[in-house]
Amino acid sequence: FVAHGAPREILTDAHPHIGSNLLPNVVKAIRESILKAGGEIHFNARVEHLLRSADGRRVRGVACADGREFEANAVLLATGHSARDVYRMLLADGLVLEQKPFAVGVRIEHPQAFVDARQYHLNPGQKRPDQLPAARYSVTATIRDRGVHSFCMCPGGFIVPAATENDEVVVNGMSLARRDSPFANSGFVVSVHPEDTESFRRKHGVLAGVAYQKALETAACRAGGGMQKAPAQKVPDFLKGRVSSSLLPTSYHPGIVPHPLHELLPAEIVWRMREGMRMFDHKWRGFAGESAQLIGCETRTSSPVRIPRDERTLEHPGLEGLYPCGEGAGYAGGIVSAALDGRRCAEALAEQMQA
């Protein structure tokens, strides 16, 4: 990242951050390096089918929606956790997939000044010194065998829309390089295990977790009323099971509308979220107070599907030369872990090519 224009501070910071405003130029520079090294990048080339050898045992490339085919001795499948069409494609091609745990919930938003005051032990009315960065936090608990935790906390950040289809509302968080928004936000999520999606399994099989996510996302879209407006609720109202009569200012630009999130989310998610919020508020007075607001839904924390691979070769056990990789394959949970898994898969592929 640094070699392609990211701030050098990320090499030593405990919580490295590039900034969503700087990232496009970094990615552009990475793309240009790939091209200079002899690589090719094909935009608008959606893969619809895997090409196989005559005996069907080995991949020999990919076929795209526009009719183009790219032949290769190996395919590294690193499509991210929101490319749901890839899962359906693999199933149609007869490949085995597995369910895995994931997490769903909401974004919780506080004034950044509130987080600063707690983390830096400031006196009432005292502002954070300019020399200190916007403060961050992490909270976690286990409630009846399920994790309840913050996720992807964004100090001085924004809540942003992250849907991939028109009938969804999905929220995520981001921060610019300076982290100077007056808001702090974080995912606040509960673990979902395969057995929690049983009601979707009869119709959707191994994609039951995907269907579970999709049901929440379309419900959030209906609750928001369209145009990517999101359902929201003050935390005290969520805890008491009532609709908020008014909402707080927010960093979410498309807008928010009052809605009972305790009715939108599954009951087993709601009561664990409530228990977690009360627990964290006991340790950190105000965490679940009048300045805290929930915006839904946060559903894309990780993939609900794992694409199996051999522990040694990292190839899919049902198709030689296919290397499932990263978050979409279920082997990573963030930027750095996905990058490390990509490197691991590239090394395994290189070893096979040199054998």
For the regions a protein language model found, what residue spans apply to each?
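Residues forming the flavin
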Residues: 1-355
